[in-house]
Amino acid sequence: FRAVPAEGKKYTYEFSRENFYVYMISHMAKHFYENGCGIRNLVDIYVFNQKYGHSIDRTQVEQELKKCGILNFERQMSELALIWMENRKCSKFYVNLFRYMIDCGIYGKSENGIWSQLCKQNAPQQKKSFNLTYYFPTAQYMKEYYPWLEGKEGLLPLAWLCRGVHGLLHRDSMERARTLKDREKYRMMMEIYHNLNLNFVK
């Protein structure tokens, strides 16, 4: 709805550069939030900022990113893009983030979807509570996958049961459970997601 008629075109609409960048980052954030995303997105960020970074209205961009809950996400990813493309020195956080994105492949992996949910409910050091969170998620989380829970929170135990049966029958769910047993990976992933502060408004 923010597209405007393209100059010299009768039937073509396009985003302003500012809105295109916000769309690009929000699309990346959506994938990162749900399944993780690959390093190809970093190339997009780097190329755009090299080409248009000095001419776009950065204040407008940051206001829109803040509304979407992804301003800090964009700042961290822009920094990582510079680190990678220009071979800059960086902290361990960016090394871990880059390795995670490489492992995600191009489109991410379904088993990565659990990290954003665990991060919402646990601090990085709260490893002892992740089992409870993973096997018995909050009603808010469960409603995303079981819409019939809306207004019927008393049926939450039934939804947990359905989720458990689904987990036993699907390979991705079993892989997630195995991954969560790796204490070092759990700590690293919690640090990544907390530092990105990804409060993505879906």
What are these regions (language model features)?
Residues 1-202:
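Conserved NTP-donor binding/palm subdomain of two-metal-ion nucleotidyltransferases/polymerases, i.e.
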